[in-house]
Swiss-Prot record:
Segments of the chain annotated as binding DNA: 28-48
Enzyme Commission number(s) from the entry: 3.4.21.88
Class in the EC hierarchy, top level: hydrolase
The protein's name in its UniProt record: LexA repressor
């Protein structure tokens, strides 16, 4: 399983878009110019990294010798820090993409969140793990959800009663978060559908 850095994803996207628009891949010089690299050699280093990860093939002896080996859609985006008031899946929040089949999860995963803290440790969700999330607002009491409260994003077990929502931790050291829907902004960003251990990617 492969992960692209944000810069590698930029290079990959540029190659894909250039092929879509012109029918041929860009030269190293064109990549360097488009992305602000100092020289074509810098572009070459990124191409070699993409080739090592198996997402492109470099054809030797040709200035445009680049062939794509994967489609972007196979990558699940990892969402980083989210600024207040902005959509969770805004492009600027996507740190990288993990080459994992979304259909591994039921329902399928739309994005990944890096878990921060140990509030859900009792059900095996640990600090640094990647939480696979299905984007939906259709959730039921008792499910593990990704919720946004006044622009803070958290992962907890849902319990809703009337105008009050209790977000329950799976760690006795953490008190429930109580949300008054009449006074606080609250939304469901998605349903947790699986966990990828942090050590799986080391």
């Amino acid at each position: 399983m492969k992960v692209l850095t944000a810069r590698q994803q930029q290079v990959y996207d540029l190659i894909r878009d250039h092929i879509a628009q012109t029918g041929m891949p860009p030269t190293r010089a064109e990549i360097a110019q488009q992305l602000g690299f100092r020289s074509p050699n810098a572009a070459e280093e990124h191409l070699k990294a993409l080739a090592r990860k198996g997402v492109i093939e470099i054809v030797s002896g040709a200035s445009r010798g680049i062939r794509l080996l994967m489609e972007e859609e196979t990558g699940i985006p990892l969402v980083g820090r989210v600024a207040a008031g902005e959509p969770l899946l805004a492009q600027e929040h996507i740190e990288c993409r993990y080459q994992v089949d979304p259909a591994m999860f039921k329902p399928s995963a739309d994005f990944l969140l890096r878990v921060s803290g140990m509030s859900m440790k009792n059900i095996g969700i640990m600090d640094g793990d990647l939480l696979a999330v299905h984007k939906t607002e259709d959730v039921r009491n008792g499910q593990i959800v990704v919720a946004r409260i006044d622009d803070e994003v958290t992962v907890k077990r849902l319990k809703k009663q009337g105008n009050t929502v209790h977000l329950l931790a799976e760690n006795e050291e953490f008190a429930p978060i109580v949300v008054d829907l009449r006074q606080q902004s609250f939304s469901i960003e998605g349903l947790a559908v699986g966990v990828i251990r942090n050590s799986d990617w080391s």
